[in-house]
Design a protein with these regions (language model features):
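Active-site machinery of serine-nucleophile hydrolases
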Residues: 133-150, 342-365
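Alpha/beta-hydrolase-fold enzymes
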Residues: 12-43, 47-48, 180-295
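Active-site nucleophile elbow and catalytic-triad environment of alpha/beta-hydrolase enzymes
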Residues: 289-312
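Short beta-strand/loop motif that positions the catalytic acidic residue
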Residues: 316, 322-324, 328
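N-terminal cap/lid segment of alpha/beta-hydrolase-fold proteins
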Residues: 56-109, 369
Length: 418
């Protein structure tokens, strides 16, 4: 009996060691980009980006554990920053809210506002957003956080819609409102996961954008929803588990507001079947039953193509930094060659690829208990400073060229060697 017990314990330990990936070592981020000057500006402000990222020793080398802990716990000893909630009534009669957090501490030379777009169904109350906001405030940045329509439990919807994967107008309304309040501020746009897609799409669409925008940062997005969903539909590596969680969260938001979203009038207008929505097992099923119908698309593929920033990024002229982790189980490694190639072929673009970090985790330090501030929080504050430095070095003529023309000088190809 003791031999059998020892064998069972040995098997369990082997499985745990494999899942936790504890034999892995800390690695330096790979840096892609051809614009040497732009990259050096970022690294000058944030030299630690050249150093190995050291996850929490016992579990931080597992992308699954990082992702799950991020979803369940968020951050260690999370602060609750105090901000002001702004409400806007949109032309479609929807109520859009965003929260503004002023910088704390001494006066700072530059007035910079970080405009944050959270992940799918997330808000200013999400734990990882609160931690990042507090850390940014302490470094002199004003923060504004978009609350996706329908995501806040205490805010009822007043129109006939909630947020969508590719609808950038809500983010644009927040930017416009911010500039009415702070007309001289410089803007750094930051997006997490789905928010990264929305920020990148907003900066790439053919639309008028304010000159106050000095750069953008995208974290852990998949770039192409068609490829991303095709990957998540596979059973290997717990992919369908993550897809089920995302589907259930999205459906819960719809059903929370079903008195409006699934009213008899809207069900008749869009051909909605409440039973199909309730029984949808995957996001493509739910998008077939609800999203593509209310947004007026013939197929789910058409909806995903319209929503994905990858199909717009050839128009991107704003300085941009992208961050992904190779062990991210949601924005998976096979999606990353696209952004590597993009960074290699465009100026004022930098791509950071980490071996570990999971989906929006990036916990660091300690043996079992992680540091309260993650590698990602530190990186985003540093990159924002680098974007400001790169912007301040440009002449007015160069600023105009950045917004209107694409340069073609090849400086670096492949991973940036530092």
């Amino acid at each position: 009996m003791s031999t059998v017990l020892l064998a069972v314990i040995a098997v369990i330990l082997c499985v745990l060691f494999r899942i936790l990936n504890v034999n892995s070592q800390a690695q330096k981020p790979l840096i892609f980009g051809r614009d040497k000057t732009f990259i050096e500006n970022i690294l000058f402000i944030s030299p630690f980006l050249k150093n190995p990222y050291v996850p929490t020793r016992l579990w931080g080398f597992s992308g699954h554990v990082q992702t799950i802990l991020h979803s369940l716990i968020g951050r260690v000893r999370c602060p609750w920053p105090i901000g002001a909630r702004i409400s806007l009534t949109l032309p479609c009669k929807s109520t859009l809210t965003y929260d503004v957090y002023e910088p704390v501490g001494s006066e700072h030379e530059d007035d910079v506002t970080v405009a944050i777009c959270p992940g799918i169904g997330n808000t200013s109350e999400s734990v990882y957003i609160r931690t990042y906001v507090h850390y940014s405030q302490c470094h002199g940045y004003r923060c504004a956080v978009l609350n996706h329509i329908g995501a806040l439990h205490r805010i009822p919807i007043t129109g006939t819609r909630i947020f969508s994967y590719g609808h950038t107008d809500d983010y644009g309304y927040m930017i416009g409102s911010l500039l009415e309040k702070y007309p001289n501020t410089k803007l750094v746009l930051v997006g997490f996961s789905l928010g990264g897609n929305l920020v990148t799409k907003y900066l790439s669409e053919e639309r008028k954008r304010p000159p106050n925008i000095i750069g953008g940062i995208s974290i852990c997005q998949g770039y192409n929803a068609i490829d991303s969903l095709g990957y998540l539909l596979q059973w290997a590596n717990f992919r369908r588990f993550y897809l089920y969680i995302m589907t259930d969260n999205y459906r819960n938001i719809i059903t929370r507001h079903k008195r409006v979203l699934l009213s008899p009038e809207l069900k008749l207008r869009h051909g909605l079947d409440e039973n199909m929505i309730a029984s949808a097992g995957t996001l493509p099923d739910l998008d077939e039953a609800y999203s593509r119908r209310v947004h007026g698309f013939e197929t789910v593929t058409d909806l995903y193509r319209w929503s994905s920033c990858a199909f717009y990024m050839d128009n991107l002229k704003t300085p941009m930094v992208f961050i992904n982790a190779k062990d991210d189980p949601i924005a998976a490694e096979h999606l990353l060659p696209f952004i590597r190639n993009f960074a290699d072929s465009h100026d004022k673009v930098m791509y950071l690829e980490l071996a570990h970090g999971g989906h929006l985790g990036f916990y660091e330090g300690g043996l079992f208990f992680a540091n309260p501030v993650t590698w990602l929080d530190r990186a985003l504050v540093g990159i924002s400073g680098g974007l400001l430095m790169a912007h301040n070095k440009l002449s007015p003529k160069e600023i105009i060229m950045c917004s209107e023309e694409e340069t073609a000088t090849i400086l670096i190809r492949g991973p940036y060697r530092h």
